[in-house]
Amino acid sequence: MKWGAGLLCVLILLVAVMIGLLIRSQNQAADQPDYFEEEILVFENADSVSFPEPGQIVFVGSSSVRFWDSLTEGMRPLPIIQRGFGGAHMEHVLHNLDRVVLPYAPRAVVVFVGVNDIGSGKTPTHVGNNFRIFVDRVSASLPQTDIWLMSMKPSKARWDKWSLMREVNEHLIQLARENEHVFFEDTGATLLNSQGTPDDVYIFDGLHLNEEGYTRWINHLKPVLLARYPEFS
Protein backbone atom coordinates (compact mmCIF):
# COMPACT_ATOMS: atom_id res chain seq x y z
CA MET A 1 0.00 0.00 0.00
CA LYS A 2 2.78 2.41 0.93
CA TRP A 3 4.60 1.67 -2.33
CA GLY A 4 1.39 2.18 -4.31
CA ALA A 5 0.71 5.53 -2.64
CA GLY A 6 4.28 6.63 -3.24
CA LEU A 7 4.13 5.69 -6.91
CA LEU A 8 0.87 7.60 -7.28
CA CYS A 9 2.48 10.70 -5.77
CA VAL A 10 5.41 10.42 -8.18
CA LEU A 11 3.06 10.08 -11.16
CA ILE A 12 1.04 13.11 -10.05
CA LEU A 13 4.25 15.11 -9.67
CA LEU A 14 5.45 14.07 -13.14
CA VAL A 15 2.13 15.06 -14.71
CA ALA A 16 2.27 18.43 -12.94
CA VAL A 17 5.80 19.02 -14.21
CA MET A 18 4.82 18.08 -17.77
CA ILE A 19 1.84 20.44 -17.69
CA GLY A 20 4.06 23.20 -16.35
CA LEU A 21 6.58 22.67 -19.13
CA LEU A 22 3.82 22.69 -21.74
CA ILE A 23 2.40 25.97 -20.44
CA ARG A 24 5.89 27.48 -20.34
CA SER A 25 6.52 26.35 -23.92
CA GLN A 26 3.25 27.86 -25.11
CA ASN A 27 4.04 31.15 -23.39
CA GLN A 28 7.52 31.22 -24.91
CA ALA A 29 6.04 30.58 -28.35
CA ALA A 30 3.60 33.44 -27.91
CA ASP A 31 6.38 35.85 -26.96
CA GLN A 32 8.93 34.87 -29.63
CA PRO A 33 8.02 35.44 -33.31
CA ASP A 34 10.93 33.24 -34.44
CA TYR A 35 10.07 30.40 -32.03
CA PHE A 36 9.39 27.99 -34.93
CA GLU A 37 12.47 28.89 -36.96
CA GLU A 38 13.64 25.28 -37.20
CA GLU A 39 10.35 24.20 -38.77
CA ILE A 40 10.45 27.09 -41.23
CA LEU A 41 13.96 26.06 -42.25
CA VAL A 42 12.67 22.56 -43.03
CA PHE A 43 10.21 24.09 -45.50
CA GLU A 44 12.94 26.23 -47.07
CA ASN A 45 15.30 23.28 -47.38
CA ALA A 46 12.60 21.31 -49.18
CA ASP A 47 11.95 24.30 -51.46
CA SER A 48 15.64 24.50 -52.32
CA VAL A 49 15.44 20.97 -53.70
CA SER A 50 12.13 21.37 -55.53
CA PHE A 51 10.36 24.71 -55.48
CA PRO A 52 6.56 24.47 -55.87
CA GLU A 53 4.96 25.70 -59.07
CA PRO A 54 3.07 29.01 -58.74
CA GLY A 55 -0.71 29.14 -58.73
CA GLN A 56 -1.32 26.41 -56.17
CA ILE A 57 -3.32 26.59 -52.91
CA VAL A 58 -1.34 27.19 -49.73
CA PHE A 59 -2.70 25.94 -46.42
CA VAL A 60 -0.96 27.81 -43.61
CA GLY A 61 -1.45 27.90 -39.87
CA SER A 62 -0.89 26.06 -36.64
CA SER A 63 -0.53 22.41 -35.65
CA SER A 64 -3.99 21.51 -36.96
CA VAL A 65 -2.59 22.22 -40.44
CA ARG A 66 0.75 20.61 -39.63
CA PHE A 67 -0.87 17.33 -38.49
CA TRP A 68 -3.32 17.21 -41.40
CA ASP A 69 -1.84 14.06 -42.95
CA SER A 70 -4.73 13.55 -45.37
CA LEU A 71 -4.69 17.12 -46.71
CA THR A 72 -2.79 16.72 -49.99
CA GLU A 73 -4.40 13.43 -50.98
CA GLY A 74 -7.85 14.34 -49.69
CA MET A 75 -7.96 17.61 -51.64
CA ARG A 76 -6.97 16.14 -55.01
CA PRO A 77 -7.17 17.31 -57.77
CA LEU A 78 -6.59 20.66 -56.04
CA PRO A 79 -2.82 21.33 -55.84
CA ILE A 80 -1.86 21.89 -52.22
CA ILE A 81 1.18 23.38 -50.48
CA GLN A 82 1.01 22.48 -46.78
CA ARG A 83 2.66 24.97 -44.43
CA GLY A 84 1.45 24.35 -40.89
CA PHE A 85 3.91 24.67 -38.05
CA GLY A 86 4.05 24.07 -34.31
CA GLY A 87 1.50 25.67 -32.03
CA ALA A 88 1.59 28.83 -34.10
CA HIS A 89 -0.22 32.05 -33.25
CA MET A 90 -1.11 34.59 -35.91
CA GLU A 91 2.01 36.55 -34.88
CA HIS A 92 4.13 33.60 -36.02
CA VAL A 93 2.30 33.39 -39.34
CA LEU A 94 2.79 37.12 -39.89
CA HIS A 95 6.46 36.89 -38.94
CA ASN A 96 7.02 34.13 -41.52
CA LEU A 97 4.62 35.33 -44.21
CA ASP A 98 7.45 36.23 -46.58
CA ARG A 99 8.78 32.68 -46.26
CA VAL A 100 5.77 30.35 -46.10
CA VAL A 101 3.12 32.06 -48.25
CA LEU A 102 4.19 34.94 -50.49
CA PRO A 103 7.10 33.25 -52.33
CA TYR A 104 4.74 30.65 -53.81
CA ALA A 105 2.52 33.18 -55.63
CA PRO A 106 -0.49 31.00 -54.81
CA ARG A 107 -3.89 31.08 -56.45
CA ALA A 108 -5.35 30.99 -52.96
CA VAL A 109 -4.33 30.90 -49.31
CA VAL A 110 -6.33 28.95 -46.75
CA VAL A 111 -5.47 29.94 -43.19
CA PHE A 112 -6.30 28.22 -39.93
CA VAL A 113 -4.86 29.88 -36.85
CA GLY A 114 -6.09 31.73 -33.78
CA VAL A 115 -7.17 29.10 -31.29
CA ASN A 116 -3.75 29.10 -29.62
CA ASP A 117 -3.91 32.88 -29.45
CA ILE A 118 -7.19 32.75 -27.53
CA GLY A 119 -5.93 29.84 -25.44
CA SER A 120 -2.98 31.95 -24.31
CA GLY A 121 -5.20 34.82 -23.17
CA LYS A 122 -5.25 37.13 -26.18
CA THR A 123 -8.50 38.96 -26.81
CA PRO A 124 -10.76 38.40 -29.83
CA THR A 125 -10.11 41.99 -30.92
CA HIS A 126 -6.34 41.42 -30.81
CA VAL A 127 -6.68 38.26 -32.88
CA GLY A 128 -9.09 39.93 -35.30
CA ASN A 129 -6.70 42.84 -35.82
CA ASN A 130 -3.90 40.42 -36.63
CA PHE A 131 -6.09 38.71 -39.21
CA ARG A 132 -6.71 42.11 -40.77
CA ILE A 133 -2.94 42.66 -40.98
CA PHE A 134 -2.61 39.24 -42.62
CA VAL A 135 -5.25 40.08 -45.22
CA ASP A 136 -3.74 43.50 -45.90
CA ARG A 137 -0.23 42.12 -46.40
CA VAL A 138 -1.26 39.25 -48.65
CA SER A 139 -3.54 41.52 -50.69
CA ALA A 140 -0.82 44.15 -51.09
CA SER A 141 1.70 41.62 -52.41
CA LEU A 142 -0.71 39.33 -54.28
CA PRO A 143 -3.83 41.33 -55.17
CA GLN A 144 -5.37 38.53 -57.25
CA THR A 145 -4.83 35.83 -54.63
CA ASP A 146 -7.91 34.65 -52.75
CA ILE A 147 -7.78 34.31 -48.97
CA TRP A 148 -9.93 31.71 -47.24
CA LEU A 149 -10.40 32.15 -43.50
CA MET A 150 -11.29 28.95 -41.67
CA SER A 151 -13.36 29.55 -38.57
CA MET A 152 -12.08 28.91 -35.07
CA LYS A 153 -12.07 25.25 -34.07
CA PRO A 154 -14.26 24.18 -31.14
CA SER A 155 -12.63 21.54 -28.97
CA LYS A 156 -13.22 19.66 -25.75
CA ALA A 157 -9.95 20.93 -24.29
CA ARG A 158 -10.82 24.61 -24.83
CA TRP A 159 -14.59 24.54 -24.68
CA ASP A 160 -14.48 27.20 -21.96
CA LYS A 161 -12.98 29.56 -24.57
CA TRP A 162 -15.60 28.90 -27.23
CA SER A 163 -17.52 32.13 -26.70
CA LEU A 164 -14.30 34.10 -27.25
CA MET A 165 -13.50 32.10 -30.37
CA ARG A 166 -16.96 32.84 -31.74
CA GLU A 167 -16.16 36.53 -31.31
CA VAL A 168 -13.06 35.99 -33.44
CA ASN A 169 -15.30 34.41 -36.08
CA GLU A 170 -17.31 37.64 -36.21
CA HIS A 171 -14.12 39.55 -37.02
CA LEU A 172 -13.36 37.08 -39.81
CA ILE A 173 -16.87 37.35 -41.22
CA GLN A 174 -16.49 41.13 -41.33
CA LEU A 175 -13.18 40.84 -43.18
CA ALA A 176 -14.85 38.66 -45.79
CA ARG A 177 -17.65 41.20 -46.21
CA GLU A 178 -15.16 43.98 -46.82
CA ASN A 179 -12.91 42.23 -49.36
CA GLU A 180 -13.94 40.60 -52.62
CA HIS A 181 -11.02 38.16 -52.50
CA VAL A 182 -11.57 37.11 -48.87
CA PHE A 183 -13.91 34.27 -47.91
CA PHE A 184 -15.03 32.89 -44.55
CA GLU A 185 -15.77 29.18 -44.14
CA ASP A 186 -17.36 27.90 -40.93
CA THR A 187 -15.42 24.65 -40.77
CA GLY A 188 -15.75 24.66 -36.99
CA ALA A 189 -19.47 23.94 -37.27
CA THR A 190 -18.69 20.57 -38.86
CA LEU A 191 -17.07 19.44 -35.59
CA LEU A 192 -20.15 19.99 -33.40
CA ASN A 193 -22.83 17.41 -32.64
CA SER A 194 -26.61 17.92 -32.68
CA GLN A 195 -26.42 19.39 -29.16
CA GLY A 196 -23.96 22.03 -30.32
CA THR A 197 -21.00 20.60 -28.38
CA PRO A 198 -17.75 19.05 -29.67
CA ASP A 199 -18.33 15.72 -31.38
CA ASP A 200 -16.07 12.66 -31.06
CA VAL A 201 -13.59 13.93 -33.66
CA TYR A 202 -10.55 14.56 -31.46
CA ILE A 203 -7.52 12.57 -30.39
CA PHE A 204 -6.68 11.85 -26.76
CA ASP A 205 -5.80 15.47 -25.93
CA GLY A 206 -9.29 16.72 -26.76
CA LEU A 207 -7.72 19.46 -28.87
CA HIS A 208 -6.34 18.08 -32.12
CA LEU A 209 -8.48 16.35 -34.72
CA ASN A 210 -8.59 12.66 -35.51
CA GLU A 211 -9.07 11.27 -39.01
CA GLU A 212 -12.83 11.79 -38.89
CA GLY A 213 -12.40 15.44 -37.93
CA TYR A 214 -10.08 16.09 -40.85
CA THR A 215 -12.43 14.23 -43.19
CA ARG A 216 -15.21 16.62 -42.18
CA TRP A 217 -12.98 19.59 -42.94
CA ILE A 218 -12.13 18.15 -46.37
CA ASN A 219 -15.77 17.39 -47.14
CA HIS A 220 -16.64 21.00 -46.32
CA LEU A 221 -13.78 22.79 -48.08
CA LYS A 222 -13.11 20.70 -51.17
CA PRO A 223 -16.43 21.31 -52.98
CA VAL A 224 -16.24 25.03 -52.21
CA LEU A 225 -12.70 25.33 -53.54
CA LEU A 226 -13.43 23.27 -56.66
CA ALA A 227 -16.43 25.47 -57.40
CA ARG A 228 -14.25 28.57 -57.14
CA TYR A 229 -11.35 27.06 -59.13
CA PRO A 230 -12.88 24.80 -61.81
CA GLU A 231 -9.59 24.86 -63.69
CA PHE A 232 -8.30 22.28 -61.21
CA SER A 233 -11.19 19.85 -61.78
What are these regions (language model features)?
Residues 54-70, 88:
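Catalytic nucleophile-elbow at a beta strand-turn-alpha helix junction centered on a G-D-S/GDSL motif
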Residues 65-79, 92-128, 148, 152-156:
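Oxyanion-hole/transition-state-stabilizing segment in secreted/luminal serine hydrolases
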Residues 142-146:
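A short helix->loop->beta-strand "cap" motif at the edges of active sites that frequently abuts
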